[in-house]
């Protein structure tokens, strides 16, 4: 039976994932991705990585047919690990093990972290695949919540499991915060990042999400909202188009399931408010984000109107209209239309409208509106 595809349209500002991808094709691809589970999207990414590695092996066999098996193994390690390839490292295993993907590596590391009682979450490219667009990824990024004092014990457990673990002393001393480990038999690499001791890092740990990949194994992923904020931070530092594409992919694939208010609360902490707003426009989810804001702020708006009434600070220019005129915003209740409208006084702009039950009819807040209503909420609580 053929899949029924609904009518798909893009709002103004929508941006496809690539310059050579049409808007209609992009919309269709993400509609289909939204039908997949996290586990299914991870499997799609894993298959892409395995296929890419197998293709690379075939090409290298043709290009370097003169090499001995040991030389060939070293050549593959240098190509795949690049600057992270350890000196004199020659992969063990076989070509079958060399095409292992980062998702399988995450499963194997999960078992070690559980045995060592180390809380963690997977972030980076693997998490972006889980929540967004399928792509290949070179390594696995994992954030660990562990004291530096126990890093030697963790390194020992990793070495016993077949990992090459350099730089332990640098991490223990605080000179570095990342263990760059390589699984010897598979040429698979992971960055194990020691989490900072901050409120936001603890928030991310509390919000991590467990996903079952097999009947017996789960892995922890960063929440999609935290992944978006982190990738915006990384992209801001590196000006990376890959990070931006990952952000758009997560927003397009997750849409209504995301907590945009959470992202908008944290974005200003890292000077990301403008780029987050831009991302919601290019991903076609700005209206969803705006409506979430309007829903979340409605109790504050309703309470502000009640305060104005209690203080006799409303006016009634007609029997059906009651207006609370504040310093920054005007709240107008229309009994005939059964609506409550919020207007920004600086530019006479409607930013939200509700029906009599508080259901959002329209929402179009600016970044300044979001900030000002956060401050209003703090004052009148």
Predicted segments, located by residue:
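Compositionally biased terminal segments of proteins
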Residues: 86-309
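Broad, structure-driven detector of short, well-ordered beta-strand segments within folded domains
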Residues: 190-192, 327-333, 341, 352-354
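Short, hydrophobic/aromatic-rich segments at coil-to-beta transitions
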Residues: 174-179, 208, 316-320, 338-341
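Negatively charged, low-complexity tracts enriched in Asp/Glu with abundant Ser/Thr
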Residues: 296-332, 360, 364-369
């Amino acid at each position: 039976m053929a899949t029924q595809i609904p009518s798909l349209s893009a709002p103004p500002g929508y941006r496809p994932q690539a310059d050579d991808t049409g808007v209609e094709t992009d919309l269709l691809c993400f509609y289909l991705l939204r039908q997949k589970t996290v586990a299914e999207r991870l499997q799609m990414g894993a298959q892409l990585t395995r296929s890419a590695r197998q293709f690379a092996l075939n090409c290298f066999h043709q290009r370097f047919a003169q090499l001995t098996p040991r030389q060939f193994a070293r050549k593959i390690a240098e190509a795949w690990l690049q600057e992270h390839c350890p000196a004199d490292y020659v992969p063990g295993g076989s070509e079958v093990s060399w095409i292992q993907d980062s998702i399988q590596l995450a499963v194997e590391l999960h078992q070690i972290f559980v045995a060592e009682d180390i809380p963690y979450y997977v972030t980076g490219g693997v998490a972006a695949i889980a929540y967004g667009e399928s792509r290949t990824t070179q390594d696995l990024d994992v954030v660990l919540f562990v004291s530096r004092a126990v890093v030697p014990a963790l390194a020992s457990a990793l070495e016993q499991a077949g990992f090459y673990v350099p730089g332990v002393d640098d991490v223990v001393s605080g000179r570095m915060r990342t263990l760059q480990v390589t699984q010897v038999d598979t040429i698979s690499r992971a960055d194990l990042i020691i989490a900072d001791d901050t409120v936001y890092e603890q928030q991310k740990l509390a919000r991590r999400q467990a996903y079952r990949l097999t009947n017996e194994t789960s892995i922890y992923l960063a929440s999609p909202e935290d992944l978006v904020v982190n990738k915006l931070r990384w992209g801001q530092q590196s000006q990376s188009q890959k990070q931006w594409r990952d952000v758009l992919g997560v927003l397009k694939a997750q849409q209504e399931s995301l907590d945009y208010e959470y992202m908008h609360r944290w974005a200003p902490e890292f000077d990301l408010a403008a780029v987050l707003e831009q991302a919601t426009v290019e991903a076609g989810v700005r209206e969803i984000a705006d409506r979430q804001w309007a829903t979340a702020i409605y109790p504050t708006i309703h309470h502000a109107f009640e305060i104005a009434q209690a203080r006799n600070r409303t006016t009634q220019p007609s029997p059906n209209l009651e207006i609370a005129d504040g310093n920054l915003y005007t709240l107008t209740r229309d009994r005939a239309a059964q609506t409550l409208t919020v207007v920004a006084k600086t530019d006479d702009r409607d930013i939200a409208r509700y029906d009599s039950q508080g259901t959002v009819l329209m929402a179009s807040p600016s970044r300044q509106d979001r900030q000002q209503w956060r401050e209003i909420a703090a004052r009148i609580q």
